[in-house]
Each structure stands twice: as C-alpha cells, then as structure tokens.
Amino acid sequence: IHATGFNYQNEDEKVTLSFPSTLQTGTGTLKIDFVGELNDKMKGFYRSKYTTPSGEVRYAAVTQFEATDARRAFPCWDEPAIKATFDISLVVPKDRVALSNMNVIDRKPYPDDENVVEVKFARTPVMSTYLVAFVVGEYDFVETRSKDGVCVRVYTPVGKAEQGKFALEVAAKTLPFYKDYFNVPYPLPKIDLIAIADFAAGKEWWTHLWLNEGFASWIEYLCVDHCFPEYDIWTQFVSADYTRAQELDALDNSHPIEVSVGHPSEVDEIFDAISYSKGASVIRMLHDYIGDKDFKKGMNMYLTKFQQKNAATEDLWESLENASGKPIAAVMNTWTKQMGFPLIYVEAEQVEDDRLLRLSQRKFCASGPYVGEDCPQWMVPITISTSEDPNQAKLKVLMDKPEMNVILKNVKPDQWVKLNLGTVGFYRTQYSSTMLESLLPGIRDLSLPPVDRLGLQNDLFSLARAGIISTVEVLKVMEAFVNEPNYTVWSDLSCNLGILSTLLSHTDFYEEIQEFVKDVFSPIGERLGWDPKPGEGHLDALLRGLVLGKLGKAGHKTTLEEARRRFKDHVEGKQILSADLRSPVYLTVLKHGDGTTLDIMLKLHKQADMQEEKNRIERVLGATLSPELIQKVLTFALSEEVRPQDTVSVIGGVAGGSKHGRKAAWKFIKDNWEELYNRYQGGFLISRLIKLSVEGFAVDKMAGEVKAFFESHPAPSAERTIQQCCENILLNAAWLKRDAESIHQYLLQRKASPPTA
C-alpha cells in the first residue's frame, strides 16, 4: 500500500504518514525511501574534517545520535523506550574503512560502480536508536582479544597506530572488570574504539537519563581505580566531578537529578554537571552506604531482570533494597527528586572519655544561609573519623531529621574529629571554630588523607563564597597547605585561587593576590624544580606542570626567566620541551610576552601534527594581555585553523585570561552571535561557550546585560545555563562588595609581616 501523504510537524520533530484506506490491525513492514544530508553540525550523520600527513584536507562520515539525533540520519521512532534490532549496510568507497555496532558479515562489489563496495553488518541486539553508530573514513588499527575472547580494536588516523596502544591495553582490561563486577558478559562479539576529530559529546536518556549517565560517570572511576590504583583516582573524582556538581547545585537555577522532559530541545539542557557529576556523586555515596558486596548483588539482580527492557530509577532502588535490606528508595528520593544538598553544621563537646557531636542540616545556598519557610530535608549517610585512625570510619549514621546528637565513644580531648570521611557524602560541612582549629595540624602534618584535605578546603571556600564565613579565614587555611604533596589537592586549591583572582581583577589590588599565590606555590615549586626526578609518577609530572603554570602566570621572577629560556631552546630546536612542561611554558611566555611571542605560538600551532598539541596551544592563547593581540586571538578562534568544537576553548580562554579579555570575549560573542549559534545549532557547546565567556563578571549591571542580550537572541538549549550565569554574576558582585576590603587589609598585613612557615 503506497502512502498518499507526508505531514511534517517540524516543531515536534514528527512526520505523519497517510494511507488511502484504514490499515489492518497486526504486524506490518513500513518501507520509507528518503534522502538525508551529511551535515557539518556535529550531530546526526555528519562529516568530520581531518588533515592527511601530506597536508591535504579530507572528510570522514561519522554519527552522533545521542540524545535525539538518529532522526537526522534516518526516519525512526527516536525515543529511548522504543527498541528494535538494526540491520545496517553501508555503500562506501573501497579504500575506506566502514564500521558499525556489529561485526562485518559481508563485503561485496557494488553493481553500478567498481570503486565502491557494499559492507553488511550483523544484526544488532534489541536496542534504542541513540545507540546506533556508523563511521566511514581512513584509519589504521591495533587489535587484541580480552581475556574473555572479545575482539578489541582501537582505530587511529593513518600512520598513528602506535598511539592507540595504551587505549587498547586499557579497553582489554576493562571488559573483564565489568563482566566480573556485574556478573553480566559483554553482549557483542567485538568492540571498536575510535577518536573522532570533530565531536561534540556523548549523552543519553530523558527523565531517567541521570541514571544512565551518572552511573557511567561513577563506574568509569571505579574501573580506573581497579586497573590503575596508583592514579589515586577518587581524589581526582572529588575535584573533577563532586565539587563541580556542588557548585552548580547550590544555585537557585539548579534542577533535580530527575527531570521530566517535554521537548527534544530540553534534552541537551539536562545534560549538565547535575546529570553527570551529581548523578555519579550520589551513586558513589549510595555505594558507600550499601557496601560493595550488597551493591554488586543488587546490580546483578537489576541488570539480569532488565537486560533488554526499559527500567526506571525506582527499579534500581528496589533491586538494591532487596540486596541490602536498607531503605534505599526513601534515602535516594531525597537526593534525586529535589534539587540542592544540605550543609551540615557540627559542634563538639567532650563528655568525660566521649565526644558528643551536635549535628544540624539546612539547605546549602550559594547566596548565603537558607531563609525559606519549609527547609528541604535529606536523609544523609554520615561517616565520622578521628585522628586515631584517619582512614577508617569511627561511626556511620543515617541523619534522617533536621537535628541529631551523636556520641563517639573513647575519643581523647586532644584528638580531632572529622565528618564525611573520603568526601563521599554529597553535603558540605561547617565546623565550629574550635573543631576547625583542631583540624589544621592534620593538614600541615598530612595525617588527614588527601581527599579529606581537599574536601575541607573546598567546603571552606564555598562557605566564604556564600558569605557564611569570611574569605580571610579561607586564605589562612590555604597557608596551612605549605607541605602538601598531592597533585589533586593542589589542583583544587589552584582552581579556587583562580576564582578568587578573577574576582579581584575587578579591584585595584589584583597584584597583591598574585603575591599571595606566589607565596603559597613557591615552596612546592622549589621542591619539584623543572626536571623529573627518578621514581616520580604520572601525578608528579601533572603537579609540576600545574605549579609552574601558576607561578609563571603570577609573574614569579625565576619561573618566568626559566620559562623564556626553555621556550627559546624549544622553538630553535635545541631542546624540545616535554609534553608536561609545554602548557605552563606557553602560558607563561604568552602572559608576559608581546606580538612576536603570539606569532611564534600561532606558527607552532600551524606546524603541529598532533591535535593534542594544537589544543594545548589553543587553551593558553587567551593569556595574552594587549587589546590588539586579544583581538587577533579572537579572530583566530573563528578561522579555519581551529576545529569548530575547539573555538569554544579559545574564546573561553580569552575570557578567563584577563579583565580586558573578559570584556573583549563578550563583545566578540555578541558581534559574531549568528555565526556561533548556527555553528553549534543549540547543542551543549553553545551552553559551554556562554558559561566560559561571562561567568567571570562581578558587576550587577552585567547580569542585566547578559539577560537582555539572550532575550533578544534566544538560545533555547542554553536557557538554564544563561540563568545560572546571571545568578553567578550577581553572587560574584555580592561577594566582592562583602569581602574585598577585608581581603585587601589581610593581604597588606601579610606584606608588612610575612608569615613564617
């Protein structure tokens, strides 16, 4: 029966097919002939640009269907709940590689053209449309088999197969780990990994999206910890995911983890740090609350039951509840169905040989103490440790009311007590002044574990930003980190000092905070030096790069001189910089350089054959200070030299580089809005661009200007990001008004009488 009409509902992204008579009830086959577009929007079926070793520009054809873009490639019911098997055939030039989800079962000449072949793939398991993938391009590969017999390949640009070996080794290790952990085997005969040159990002599932994404974000860390215990990966998780999620979730313009979605354009909106990072953080807290053994048992029950069916969040809670006997649904609903998280205030009293703790919870708000009538409540799994054994929980309790008292048996008066062991609970802690004072020696002598030192410092910084404590208190605590050896702790400290520096760039004492940065980072800089020492690990190399970059940016004299010397040798080919030192050296010479320095950097960018090196250069270009050079960098950002998705980090780098850069980047975005918006078509990159460009402002009127601009230039998929940015600008302005003078006085006082370590 031939269809008689196609009615397109563009707004809802649907098409209605009309037939001449009523179709019979039952199973049928719908055959649709269609012509699609190989687009350049980094979504659906699109072309991805790459350069051959000889400098020729070519294109690969690749797919990115998550969340709602399979419909751009072929007509389908593009909803995660509607599943099917897929038989895929690709007709491709015979010198190109064709890949899809399944293994190739036939490859034969195409009848009409001897330069083309038809590649047929095996039928997929039952799955959602967003999981379908295909790639056509020029690639080399390396391959191995995992110990359970799955063929693993890593595809690389031609001539770069060597660079795929580490990824191959890791992939082959992870498959058996997941199989053992979940007691569910990998369901396909092969797995291909491929890095795509132009790629926006992977994302998933609607209302229950967070479960998919949050879980994936958490389990990847669990797997890395299993394969590479020396990476100290959970400390990195706290810095990269946990604190980032808390920062967003403290805003009035946050959203619960579980969000119902009405329209496809809203899907990109909920793929933010809440879905991924808060999702992962609450699953980490849940795993800790249940214990690994029962968690694995519950996961296996859940996965076995819902292997090819749709599952909702509640189904997972039920399986975990059955496995652990704990009230999982009641606890987790307080974390997934309401936005935000609690601030736990704690004070202590010694009662003979015991320590009495008084705990109370209120919602933590970035704007200061919660003042609403009905304060939301959480069921909070709380772990408490003491200096007797800083790595073990002395006590675990479930705080299921606004206030509670807890007694710790046999705690001597000279022992410190800390909440949130391992920074696992998704809450912030405010200690009474005596409790905080007692924890400082634990930072200095490193008896507090790294992840707890990081969590303590981050909580204090957030409390200061929210106006609950003074920023000066945090600066004093930061000075206690003088003996800190841990990369991730320094990384978080550095990030917070960067936020403070950006804030104080609105004042006339910006140089004083740079002196503070130099004082904090100089001792570790001297200990590390410029060159690797025998026995150093991967994290020491990262720390060296971080510290030298911080000192160089702040204008530390000897660091600047050495960076210039090494840069000159690098450019002249006398002594090539190691990968770990390139970013800090490039950043330092650009920040304190001139037009010639920028020209050399742009030349290095053009000559680089590794995308990693190009990205490294793009990220530091914004450090340049003169207005005309900043303009040159912004123009470069939109040029053919920069891949579309990397334009965002160049413009963001300019905005984050200096006071002038911030204004210039915002003007540039307004002037080039149409081109930028068309380029990213409402995907998540537009949200990222807006966030990076305006989040550093700290003047009330800028919030109004940003809001007004986007009212007249709507970006529907970035609506929530815009609201969050405006809120952050107002919060920055309030923070500056509140604390600028006391910070200035403290920095002057330090200058007059330098602290002794």
Residue ranges and their predicted role:
Residues 63-70, 75-203, 218, 254-255, ...:
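Hydrophobic helix-coil surface modules that form long, contiguous segments used
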Residues 82, 372-380:
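Short coil-to-beta strand junction motifs in C2/discoidin
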Residues 1-52, 75, 113, 404-412:
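A surface-exposed beta-strand-loop module
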Residues 47-66, 198:
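Short edge-strand/loop segments of extracellular domains
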Residues 1-4, 377-379, 383-387:
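Solvent-exposed beta-hairpin/edge-strand motifs
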Residues 1, 11-13, 60-62, 121, ...:
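Hydrophobic alpha-helical and helix-loop surface patches within well-folded domains
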Residues 18-19, 158-165, 269-270, 443-447, ...:
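Second-shell loop/turn segments in exported
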